[in-house]
Amino acid sequence: MKYFIAFHGLCCIMKKIYGLFERMCYIMCKFIPKLIFFNGAELLEGPCWDAETESLYFVSIKADTVFRFNTKTGRIKSYATDGAVGCAVLRDGKLITAEKSGIYERKIDDTEKQLIAHVYDDNIYRYNDGKLDPKGRLFVGTMGDGERQTGKCGLYRIDGENEFTCVVSGTTISNGLGWTKDSSKMFFIDTPTKEVWEFDYDLETGEISNKKVFTKIEDGAPDGMCVDIDDTLWIAHWGGSKVSHWDSRTGEYLGEIELPVSRVSCPVVGGKMMDTLYITTALDPDGNEPLSGGLFAVKIR
């Protein structure tokens, strides 16, 4: 009997060890990014998830192209733009694109587009990252087109046709944006500062106030960003080969996802169960990273 009890106890211990090993393997596999799209793009950016069609929109800035990737079928559709395109977002069933010559709106799959607004007059600028706030207002940033325009760019709120407001001035490379679930906070990145800024946000007016530094990124520079349904931040590290994860309420660092490329540009949460992080990247100019410039996906829950 005592041998049976000892054997039974050993089996229980082995079962627990196996369970822990299985869990560790699951966690390790869960956070391994997989390449899901590659065409040698110089700079992929601005992923935007469309839950209705389970499709991902993203832009190839230097190729003047918007892509739509249907995650159910694997089919890709592309839209040509008028010069460099900084971002593409969906609103009321229409596609909004921030192109070199202006911000446009069009019906999905329609070639005709309507100019909404244009915030700069000089060709030394272009649009960069942009997103809709929880009320559907477009916020879009600017940067130098080719030559850096230090402190001369900004983040703009598009208030209507040919109506816009500069909400953050004096930026250099306006980048990541995101809002908390209750719309009380907005986060924003001006990449060269290496800082992620936090603002109080008034959803009714679209006004920001009480700027403070949420965190400073030391490994690479912060690029694109998103806020998930748990109010945590995912921040792309340009030159840092990863996406870091943060608690928006406490500022606590929660972990990171490493990628096989250095120039990580922007993440977005998507998938049928909102359990997948899609990550755009840019080409390695030295040619040492064969997967650079690809689109990656990784399960996060």
Predicted region positions:
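A short helix->beta-strand "capping" segment at the edge of beta-propeller domains
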Residues: 28-40, 71, 211
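Conserved beta-strand positions in repeat-built beta-propeller and related beta-rich domains
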Residues: 40, 51, 56-62, 95-101, ...
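Glycine/small-residue-rich hydrophobic helix-like segments
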Residues: 205-269
